Amino acid sequence: MDAGRPEKEGLSPLGRFFFKEWRDIIVDGFIKRKESGLPGAHRIIPSHLALKASPGIKPENILWYEDMEQILRRSERISFMMCGCRGLWRKCDNPVDVCLQVQFPPENGEYKGEAHQYIKPPKDVSFDEALEVINRCENLGLVHIPLNTSHGDLICNCCDDCCMVINPMLNRGGGIIWEILTPSRYRAVVDQELCVGCGTCLKRCKFSAIETVDVPGSKKPKTRIINEHCLGCGVCVVKCTKKALTLELIRSPEHIPTISVMELMSRGRKT
């Protein structure tokens, strides 16, 4: 786990102070939420390219709100807006205008999504345009993170350098991120007979869930998944050219809360 990450470079003293304070405050809030027995505030949506590359997963077992392509198909309106984290910190070269907002039809006359206010209005896009952006994000190794509900309509495409959710957890260290960030219903699995030990997956994993081990008969160490650390994002699967990595389904549908966004947020305010 990459604890004690350096503060952002190029920021004013006030900016550095804010980022340090934020990293402490948000993680303390997440810990308090967990200790109160409440569901985590954020969850992982697996890469849809990784799901497609996993023949052991039957399409009928994939919930629509854990498949980026199905989420886009169900949306009445699709927009992208500037990532507040990456737009502010500019610590990496990943694209900035990739925070996804979708609008789902009301259920029984009730809108269960989230009301948003913007500094810069989002840009509406077509399904095909949105899917192209999502595919690009997945190939770059970004992780889909919405609020932890089936009705989360704002989905960030997160890096570990700038994200104001991932970065504070990684900075705190001690395995906090494995305890607080709600994993997807999936977990990576490796076929070591197909693995050639290229190390691409090791570099792409943001959650220290991959290590290399010596395997009898192999000149190179091969990939091993640390199961208790894997959050099921599928980032490692996407770039495995030998198809040695896939996802497996390990959790029930009840793992993802089906409450509204407002209910999830109001529960947090009661802690």
Residue locations for each model-derived region?
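Flexible glycine/acidic-rich beta-alpha junction loops that bind and position SAM and/or redox cofactors
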Residues: 1, 88-90, 251-257
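Short, cationic-aromatic polyanion-contact patches
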Residues: 1-3, 232-233
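Short, amphipathic alpha-helical interaction segments positioned at domain boundaries
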Residues: 2-25
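Catalytic cores of enzyme domains
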Residues: 30-183, 187
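Short cysteine clusters
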Residues: 83-85, 156-158, 163, 195-201, ...
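Ferredoxin-like iron-sulfur electron-transfer modules
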Residues: 142-151, 175-204, 208-232, 250-254
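Cys/His-rich zinc-coordinating "finger/knuckle" motifs
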Residues: 165-170, 202-208, 212, 237-243, ...
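Flanking helices and flexible, charged tails adjoining ferredoxin-like Fe-S electron-transfer domains
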Residues: 222-271
